[in-house]
UniProtKB/Swiss-Prot annotation:
Species the sequence originates in: Brucella suis (strain ATCC 23445 / NCTC 10510)
Location (main, coarse): cytoplasm
GO biological process per UniProt: tRNA methylation; tRNA wobble uridine modification
Subcellular location: Cytoplasm
GO CC field: cytosol
SUPFAM superfamilies: FAD/NAD(P)-binding domain
Pfam families to which the protein is assigned, alphabetical: GIDA
Domain of life: Bacteria
Gene Ontology MF, one: tRNA (uracil(54)-C5)-methyltransferase activity, 5,10-methylenetetrahydrofolate-dependent
Family: Belongs to the MnmG family. TrmFO subfamily.
Name of the protein: Methylenetetrahydrofolate--tRNA-(uracil-5-)-methyltransferase TrmFO
Physiological role: Catalyzes the folate-dependent formation of 5-methyl-uridine at position 54 (M-5-U54) in all tRNAs.
CC cofactor: FAD
Length: 466
């Protein structure tokens, strides 16, 4: 680390996981940083301490398996990049099987201590109530899902009232290669060809009356998650949870998101489906499909069991399960460029969950990238995005435009927060053992290992550029 104290400081707003990581990366590159955190001057309903990088929910950073799990690959890439968050997590881990879980107090205290001790980091405990003044120059906004209302209003005014969401309505996402296409078929309703469409843009899963009635009953009986007190999230008709719709009457779903009109079963064209579940392409790669209209507050265990009742999804592998909760985040693919700058004001960069990533590790990773991009610019170097084959690049690609934009569901945003998963990675050729054809689980594991190995190799090459 070399000190460039003649440089004006970078300002980072928000001392959560992303802001802490961004500040660390910038300072480690030799650039001074001012980290602004509003706690304890102003608290939130979720935070309990004034520590930086406080974990407000789980203490788990999820799987640490860097061979067959995408978040484990992200862990490994972050360690390669000198992540403060991963270093403190490793130092304060607690037993959790194959997962990386931490002593939450020890972890946050360690992050705070490291940042406070860094000679190039100044921590200001104050609330930032609006967008930064122009004299601040380069600024990273990493204010997270509980962004203070005054700052959220300022961001909305700068971008667009429709560009900032305050709740996410998340439908489950399924890996395409786990869908049984002997049961399902491609078709848009009434074969409609929309912008960029072909008339065969949806995967359709048919149900007869008996299957539909059993499915509706399971939705109603399934275990639900309650809102946390601080979320205060209202239901609104544009994105009602699927189980709430089911409770409104036995026919509600088949006249709503599961209506069969305009669809003909390609495998059995003479039999009209009683109801149809539609899946829509989620990413440009075509590796992920989301369940249209299936935002839900069902507990995860209930979701997997109930949704596998759907014909064609009996062996479904979920890249993400559904949810509906309080979350302030940008319509990032529209607003941000490929190095996380606001297109309309390039001195502003966003990081963390406010960009539309989901999870502790993902938020930290985007903070890491924002920090590295910013430091490079301050040092008159090129800010080079990571390759899309890396976990860093796959996650960044989702945020800055890898999803498919749709306008066919009133009241819903097509861009929704996402955890890192292998469906975001470009496909890879899986090496086959000589004289052996891989099938089933063996093939899936081989594919994940190939994606992981490529990601880590490409990440090392990318890091050598900095």
């Amino acid at each position: 680390m070399s000190n460039n104290t003649d440089l004006s400081p970078v300002h980072v707003i928000g001392g959560g996981l992303a802001g802490s990581e961004a500040a660390w990366q910038i300072a480690q590159a030799g650039v001074p940083v001012v980290l602004h955190e509003m706690r304890p001057v102003r608290g939130t309903d979720a935070h309990k301490t004034e520590q930086l990088a406080e974990l407000v929910c789980s203490n788990s950073f999820r799987s640490d398996d860097a061979e067959t799990n995408a978040v484990g690959v992200l862990h490994a890439e972050m360690r390669l990049a000198g992540s403060l968050i991963m270093a403190c997590a490793d130092a304060h881990q607690v037993p959790a099987g194959g997962a990386l879980a931490v002593d939450r107090e020890g972890f946050s205290q360690a992050v705070t201590a490291r940042l406070e001790a860094h000679p190039l980091i100044t921590i200001e405990r104050e609330e930032i109530t609006g967008l930064p003044p122009t004299e601040w120059g380069t600024t990273i906004i990493a204010t997270g899902p509980l962004t203070a209302p005054s700052l959220a209003e300022a961001i909305a005014a700068e971008t667009d009232a429709d560009a900032l969401a305050f709740f996410d309505a998340i439908a489950p996402i399924i890996h395409f290669d786990s869908i049984n296409m002997d049961v399902c078929w491609f078709q848009s309703r009434y074969d409609k060809v929309g912008p960029g469409g072909t008339g065969k843009d949806y995967i359709n899963c048919p149900m007869d009356k008996e299957q539909y009635e059993a499915f509706v009953a399971a939705l109603i009986e399934g275990d639900k998650t309650d809102f946390k007190e601080w979320e205060g999230t209202p239901y609104f008709d544009g994105c009602l949870p699927i189980e709430v719709m089911a409770e409104r009457g036995p026919e509600t779903l088949r006249h709503g998101p599961m209506k069969p009109m305009g669809l003909t079963n390609a495998h059995n064209p003479t039999v009209k489906p009683y109801a149809v579940v539609q899946l829509r392409q989620e990413n440009a790669l075509g590796t992920l499909y989301n369940m249209v209209g299936f935002q839900t507050k069902l507990k995860y265990g209930s979701q997997t069991g109930i949704f596998k009742m759907i014909p064609g999804l009996e062996n479904a592998e979920f890249a993400r399960l559904g949810g509906l909760h309080r979350n302030t985040y940008l319509n990032s693919p529209v607003l941000l460029d490929n190095v996380l700058r606001l297109k309309s004001r390039q001195t502003l960069r966003f990081a963390g969950q406010v960009t539309g990533c989901e999870g502790y590790v993902e938020s930290s990773a985007i903070g890491l990238l924002a920090g590295r991009f910013t430091a490079a610019e301050k040092l008159s170097q090129a800010a080079v995005p990571p390759p899309p084959t890396t976990a860093f690049g796959a996650l960044l690609g989702h945020i800055t435009g890898g999803h498919i934009v749709t306008d066919d569901e009133p009241g819903k945003r097509s861009f929704q927060p996402m955890n890192v998963n292998f469906g975001l990675f470009p496909p890879v050729d899986v090496p086959k053992p000589e004289g052996k054809r891989l099938r089933g689980k063996e093939k899936t594991i081989a594919k994940k290992r190939a994606l992981s190995a490529r990601a880590l190799a490409d990440c090392r090459n990318w890091l050598s550029l900095y």
